[in-house]
Amino acid sequence: MVDLTHAKWRPNRYGGSEKKRTLLFDGKIYMVKFPEPPRSKKTSVSYIGNQFSEHIGCQIFQSLQIPAQNTFLAKYCEPVTGKEKIVVVCEDFCQNGNRLLEFSKIGHHDTGSDKTYTTTIEDVYEIIERFDFAVNKFAIKKHFWNMFVVDALLGNPDRHLDNWGLLEDSAGRIKPAPVYDCGSSLSPLSSDERKNLLLQDENLMKIEEYNLCSVYRHQGKRIFYHEILKTPPADLHRSILEIVPRIKFAAPRIDALI
């Protein structure tokens, strides 16, 4: 495992909820995410396992042939406390003239409407349909639903308008950005004891699965993954038919990764 204790750090350029630093490594810029203490008192874990969720989640997306940010795990020793931490190192894909267009910010582009867009499927579609720049709208919708299917597999409850988007290159060409921000996947707040309990109790596991929901709403109701996957909209159905066979094919590799 790479040791970043004496790495070449740059002034931080990244925001968001977790603590981050900017790293120059092998001639490339990386965002380094650090583990944080949980914000909720309802968990017994001392640190959120979001760095492992980020790395494994992105690796699973890549194994399913969906572009995602390149990541690796590394160790870092705090110079003041001497405490060693495991961090996730995420390659910045906004290099060589590329620029990330967060989906929420694209919604602000629509000055012809006074509407405030929220995390509903209807609003996602409305934003896409109102694009007035050159982009493949079908490809954006397909990317959204492909990402949705894999987020369901990962149990990600926190894919919203701020953590996915489009990538614009130096020539102005626009396409879906690589998937990033998978830190809420794979139950990062669950303790090892809780996970072992779920593995041993089939009924408890089913309850856990049935309570998994997306942050999105559809037709006025919060989306529970198990419900919408049973009766999917047409575009989601197409993504299910495309992604599920990939999941089955990649299952041994995913198991080995986890």
Predicted regions and their residues:
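A diffuse structural propensity rather than consistent per-protein peaks
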Residues: 102, 117-123, 250-257
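Conserved ATP-binding subdomain of kinase catalytic cores across diverse folds
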Residues: 1-112
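Conserved kinase catalytic-core segment
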Residues: 122-191
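Glycine-rich loops and low-complexity Gly/Arg-rich segments
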Residues: 57, 61, 113-117, 191, ...
